[in-house]
């Protein structure tokens, strides 16, 4: 898939536009915000007739946070965000930044002057790996599975027969004549639906499709907890996949991995120059077998992040 970048003139950051309310800040810091994907990350908005994108990221130990991307030549200084009180959240509205724009957060930490560039933890879309930038996107889609949902809602799921077909989308079927590439979400939908129905399965369980840098992990080392992997298409392509299976009376189960995450430089590890998402005690924050990081479940904001991710996919 070809990703486009904005050609609009981009203005300086404005701080008068925010998607976060006082209640949002309170719930987030308390550990009870379950819909962060509606407030944080990158969201296309229009304010006073001006179209642009609101950026929001949690980095409580940062001295400065700026957005760099394809819209400003990846400049690390021109578009700084502003901290919102004591919430640890940095936010700003950048006029002219549109759908398809690539971006990252440049974080200058209070911790020993540490500087890093990070992908957006709440991004809805990313570049196709091995590239690691986040992509400004929306979730506009017209669903056609109302009949399936109505039927499912009326059924007694506790007593209904259930037969699950587990599948890794990237290896289930490939195209040998095109360098053995995997099928896209839209290509695999009719093939998988037909195969599953012929075999009599009621459900498909997908190995993790959330974005992940290491293909060999089969998705079990997640970096994008709100983004379907770009390896097979866009978020709308994934929605089409789920929609198609629903229309053919196949329920979809998603594997979700809140247990650990990889230490890749663009990801969650050492996010703002401190152990933010992972536990600071290596006995609790590092998985010796997988060489991955373990979430700090005792941190309220981490709980908000993980619960929001779980709710996002429902």
Q: Predicted regions span which residues?
A:
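Structural beta-strand segments of beta-rich domains
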Residues: 51-56
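Short beta-strand elements bearing conserved aromatic residues within extracellular beta-rich modules
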Residues: 65-67, 103
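Short, surface-exposed loop motifs enriched in S/T, G, D/E and P with embedded aromatic residues
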Residues: 76-85
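Short proline/glycine-enriched turn/loop motifs at strand-loop junctions of beta-rich domains
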Residues: 58-65, 74
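The feature marks proteins involved in alpha-glucan
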Residues: 1-50, 84-166, 171-180, 184-187
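Substrate-binding/active-site clefts of carbohydrate-active enzymes
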Residues: 150-159, 168-314
